[in-house]
Regions:
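A non-transmembrane, solvent-exposed segment enriched in polar/low-complexity residues
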Residues: 86, 129, 134-335
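Conserved redox-active cysteine motifs that mediate thiol-disulfide chemistry
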Residues: 518-535
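Conserved helix-turn-beta segment immediately C-terminal to the redox Cys motif
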Residues: 512-513, 530-551, 618, 622-624
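Conserved segment of the thioredoxin-like fold in thiol-based oxidoreductases
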Residues: 528, 538-579, 584, 588-591
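Short, well-ordered beta-strand segments enriched in hydrophobic/aromatic residues
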Residues: 49-58
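Short, solvent-exposed, Trp/other aromatic-anchored flexible loops in extracytoplasmic proteins
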Residues: 81-126
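Oxidative protein folding and maturation machinery
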Residues: 164, 169, 252-512
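Thiol/disulfide oxidoreductase modules built on the thioredoxin-like
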Residues: 577-621
Length: 625
């Protein structure tokens, strides 16, 4: 009998040691999150379940979804799969009410005893899946923030002037560290470096995160210029100078806290970014400076319809002067004030440059269902006739100030002038940058430098010449490499009537499931979607699916020929007349547009715009055996 009692007592002790004590953690702090759409408002631990109360906030009338593949992991490596949802149906669209806020629960098995924190993770194959790391269960406090060995943040002297800004070309190194990084977090980050000629040009620059949270990215830049690191849907801003290194430590816990529903007003978890590199004051005061730069008033759509171009200009100048006054009276460092004042002048010019498009957009919106293309064109022509040739000439001097290179508005002015073929009146920095951008546009379209362009380049600054020569060498190497690539095929449409063209194209692949992609070489979303679908195409390579790409003459032939080697599939380039017919007939209202055709030649799905890899894969698999 004694042995039986001891056995029962031991069994009870074992059960107690394996299950958590019943308790509730209200508004638990967490390490980081990749979303602001959901947040844990309460954790309830019992011997039978673990329940997360979820507070959701999202656009009213839009939906979110909780995946049935979601799970919890704890600090000991144990996994707890999701069991049920209360107030939300797993894998079903949860439509947000008018308030944009909602609450529901998700249920998991009981945690093992002694768990300090949990992560909520939706499976890796869930596109845009929610992740919340380090939900604290013990004392509701985060562990001490630890920095990489040897890192030292640049100290900011509030009285120091902005360092001299000199145009240069060369290698810049970005060294980063994701603080609190651990296994299970995303192992890649995106580094974007701004080009003062055309904005972001390296949007696909992914870098690997090492197990210790560090990463390094090296690039050739024309600058100085600005850059961003995007990780777990959080963005850190910095600056780069050719020949120098920028070091940054990304504090995910503070970035997540600032946008938290329940902890935004709590004591900060340090700085969002710790930085050692060029223009340290600008980085340290980035948020405060941007608030002053971006807080200006703007005209409503109704006001835009009644304002003259001259009145628009007066309004924008008044607002800019108000913003400059606020900058001068702020507590910003002298360096950041100098930058902010220049950035505001650049922003003013960019705003004046965009005035016609803003007014036209307001006019189109005002017409609603009565929109008429001829009417809009007449309105546009009348508007443009009212714009003086010297509309903003007295404000242009700031574009020759090298500090303008640090402003994101500068590239829009340079690229717009290059596209319009505008030739600035003087031969200052702006004229030099526009001249460089004009030549660079050809390289972007896979057109190597001509002898005439090489001669023209001699009048440009040495840095611009170095940049163009380097880009030309890269292009020549790419063209040679493309000659050896396989996996794509150029097809001729042949002599066929417009009304038979689509049927003729898809009939070449009868008996197969066909994904038809209407796209263009100049379309950024098209190019991004093509890249995102590469893993999907590899995964479905054993399925009987053909990928058909149709573009028109707006895609320059040379650009198209050198872009398609990296887009595996069947390619067609049609005439402007054929393109117009196809767009009208099949409702191609913009690019990209996707049409899925079954094995019998019937259209089963269409999407204007990229619907995402998951949706595309779902529609294709519906039709495959």
């Amino acid at each position: 009998m004694k042995n039986i009692c001891l056995y029962v007592w031991g069994l009870l002790m074992l059960l107690v040691s394996c299950t958590p004590e019943n308790r509730v953690i209200d508004k638990p702090v967490f390490l980081a999150s990749n979303t602001t759409s959901i947040e844990v408002s309460k954790v309830t631990l019992t011997d039978s379940t673990t329940v997360l109360d979820i507070f959701a906030r999202y656009t009213p009338g839009w939906w979110i979804k909780i995946a049935s593949t979601g799970y919890l992991t704890d600090d000991k490596g144990n996994t707890y799969p999701i069991q049920a949802g209360h107030g939300v149906e797993l894998d079903k669209e949860f439509w947000m009410p008018e308030s944009g806020e909602a609450e529901f629960q998700i249920v998991f098995p009981p945690l093992k005893r002694g768990v300090k924190y949990i992560d909520y993770i939706e499976a890796p194959d869930v596109e845009g899946g929610f992740i919340i790391w380090g939900i604290q269960l013990k004392d509701n406090q985060l562990p001490e923030l630890k920095f990489p060995k040897g890192f030292k943040e640049t100290e900011v002297d509030k009285n120091a002037s902005l360092p001299e800004v000199k145009l240069a070309y060369g290698e810049a190194i970005i060294k980063g560290h994701v603080l609190d990084y651990r296994e299970g977090m995303p192992n890649k980050a995106t580094v974007l470096v701004y080009s003062p000629l055309m904005g972001y040009t390296n949007a696909d620059a992914e870098v690997d995160i090492a197990p210790d949270g560090s990463f390094t990215y090296t690039t050739q830049v024309l600058g100085p210029t600005t850059g961003h690191v995007i990780y777990a849907d959080k963005t850190a801003n910095f600056y780069v100078i050719p020949g120098e290194t920028s070091e940054l430590c990304i504090n995910l816990r503070e970035m997540s806290r600032k946008v938290s529903k329940f902890h935004a007003d709590a004591q900060p978890y340090g700085k969002e970014l710790y930085y050692n590199g060029p223009f340290a004051a600008l980085v340290a005061e980035n948020a405060e400076a941007n608030q002053l730069i971006n807080r200006g008033r703007s005209l409503s759509k109704e006001e835009l319809l009644s304002v003259s171009m001259e009145d628009f200009k007066k309004f924008e100048i008044t607002v800019t002067e108000e913003q400059k006054k606020a900058v001068c009276e702020s507590s910003l460092s002298e360096a950041t004030k100098a930058y902010a004042l220049t950035a505001l002048s650049n922003r003013l010019l960019a705003s004046l440059d965009s005035a016609p498009s803003r007014i036209i957009s307001a006019y189109i919106d005002s017409k609603g269902d009565k929109y008429d293309e001829d009417d809009v064109m007449a309105y546009y022509q009348k508007l443009m006739k009212s714009v003086p040739t010297d509309y903003a000439s007295e404000l242009m001097d700031v574009l020759d100030n090298p500090v303008s290179l640090l402003s994101v508005a500068y590239a829009s002015m340079v690229s717009h002038a290059a596209v319009k073929g505008t030739t600035p009146k003087n031969d200052g920095l702006f004229a030099q940058m526009v001249g460089t951008a004009k030549i660079s546009r050809g390289l972007t379209d896979f057109q190597p430098l001509t002898e005439a362009q090489k001669e023209e380049m001699k009048a440009l600054p040495e840095a611009c010449q170095q940049y163009l020569n380097a880009k030309n060498e890269e292009l020549l190497a790419t063209i040679e490499a493309n000659k050896k690539k396989t996996g794509f095929r150029v097809n001729e449409t042949g002599e066929v009537a417009d009304e038979d063209l689509f049927a003729s194209i898809i009939s070449k692949f009868d008996g197969k499931v066909r994904l038809v992609d209407f796209w263009a070489t100049w379309c950024g979303p098209c190019r991004m979607a093509n890249k995102e679908m590469i893993p999907m195409k590899e995964e479905l390579k054993d399925k009987d699916i053909v990928y058909i790409y149709i573009t028109g003459e707006t895609s320059p032939k040379g650009t198209w020929e050198n872009m398609i080697p990296d887009i595996h599939g069947e390619h067609f380039r049609v005439t402007d007349k054929q393109w117009s017919y196809l767009c009208d007939k099949y409702g191609v209202e913009g690019v990209p547009t996707y049409i899925v055709v079954d094995t019998e030649g019937e259209i089963k799905y269409k999407s204007v715009g990229f619907p995402g890899v998951s949706k595309m894969k779902e529609e294709l698999l519906k039709l495959t055996k």
